[in-house]
């Protein structure tokens, strides 16, 4: 029988800090283009539907590569797989900043490569944290980890718009991130361990036995796990909303400002990215508050109700729906009220991130965690494109 695997607590927290930092950069990469979308459209002369296709290509490549990374993450070195992913997405992001206007198809291709690289992190990193911490400790660490989804998204808008404002060239936003990602790669290699599967629960022997099962057997097992299936459908619905909100909100706010006569239309670069800065700041603040509220409410409420997690997710999503609806309806008449309801909607949506991750780790029962993670991705692949086609109508 293998000896129990152990790691000093300070090392576990240090590894968690590094993974949180990389998660921040991961989501900055997801949404940095949204922060300068008008400039990108003007530079490549693409319509709203093609701009949305840009995000669909990104997510589609993430989807197609997620099964590969899920398989590798469950059976081989997670640390090596993560390192490869960071190298791929940072290299592709840097390369995309040097593409000339007549090669827009190449920009789409590189954004797809960025999506492929980020797939490794989205599927594997949470499982590493799950093997470093247990129970309430794991819930808190995952809450902090998932805070960096809205924080990274918001900072992506801020970085893109601020760098464009300073330099007059949106390409520089894509050239700064790879420098930060090079630091992240060094920290990952030096400070993050690769714990055995199930190490935190001291189930190393069980985990090793389960790894012998086939990939198809894993899929069959998860397809019969109704907690996993239903929570995945819930995450899909939330992704439909957050995908549209995250990609199009800055452009929507810009055009609402034009309707109110507060802003001239963007006819040449650089565009006024004030709304990207404001929306980015809102996303950061509401994201931090929402993730902390959701995680703490879940931790406290499940002491009296074992179904606390799904109830918190459902109630926050139901409450977010009218807020986001009012934000859209009120934008042409009262701009301030639109911002208020948009912030409330974002806060309520953010309550779900850490909670659904905890649900995933609980329902997998020590089996293929990275495979579970990638199975949440397929339904979301085409979500940006319907919204984007509608904006051209």
Mark where each language-model region is:
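Helix-loop-helix hairpin linking two adjacent transmembrane segments in secondary transporters
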Residues: 145-194
């Amino acid at each position: 029988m293998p000896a129990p695997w152990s790691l000093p607590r300070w090392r576990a927290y240090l590894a968690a800090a590094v993974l949180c930092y990389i998660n921040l950069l991961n989501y900055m990469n997801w949404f940095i283009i949204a922060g300068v979308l008008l400039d990108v459209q003007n530079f490549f002369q693409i319509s709203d539907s093609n701009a949305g296709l840009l995000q669909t290509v990104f997510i589609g490549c993430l989807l197609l590569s997620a099964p590969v990374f899920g398989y590798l993450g469950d059976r081989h070195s997670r640390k090596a797989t993560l390192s490869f992913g960071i190298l791929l997405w940072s290299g592709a992001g840097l390369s995309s900043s040097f593409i000339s206007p007549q090669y827009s198809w190449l920009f789409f291709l590189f954004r797809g490569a960025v999506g492929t690289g980020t797939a490794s992190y989205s599927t594997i990193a949470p499982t590493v944290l799950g093997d470093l911490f247990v129970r309430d400790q794991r819930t808190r660490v995952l809450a902090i980890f998932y805070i960096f989804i809205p924080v990274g998204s918001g900072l992506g808008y801020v970085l893109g718009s601020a760098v464009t404002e300073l330099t007059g060239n949106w390409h520089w936003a894509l050239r700064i991130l790879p420098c930060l990602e090079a630091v992240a790669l060094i920290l990952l290699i030096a400070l993050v361990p690769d714990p055995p599967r199930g190490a935190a629960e001291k189930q190393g022997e069980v985990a090793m036995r389960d790894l012998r099962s086939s990939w198809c057997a894993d899929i069959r097992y998860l397809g019969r796990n109704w907690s996993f299936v239903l929570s995945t459908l819930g995450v899909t619905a939330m992704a439909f909303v957050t995908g549209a909100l995250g990609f199009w909100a800055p452009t929507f706010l810009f055009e609402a400002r034009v309707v109110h006569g507060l802003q001239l239309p963007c006819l040449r670069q650089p565009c006024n990215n004030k709304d990207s800065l404001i929306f980015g700041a809102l996303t950061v603040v509401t994201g931090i508050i929402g993730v902390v509220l959701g995680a703490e409410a879940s931790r406290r409420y499940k002491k009296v109700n074992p179904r606390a997690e799904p109830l918190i997710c459902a109630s926050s999503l139901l409450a977010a729906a009218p807020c986001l609806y009012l934000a859209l309806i009120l934008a042409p008449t009262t701009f301030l009220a639109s911002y208020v309801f948009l912030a409330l909607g974002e806060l309520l949506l953010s309550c779900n991130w850490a909670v659904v991750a905890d649900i995933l780790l609980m329902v997998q029962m020590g089996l293929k965690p990275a495979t579970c993670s990638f199975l949440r991705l397929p339904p979301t692949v085409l979500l940006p494109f319907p919204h984007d086609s509608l904006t051209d109508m």
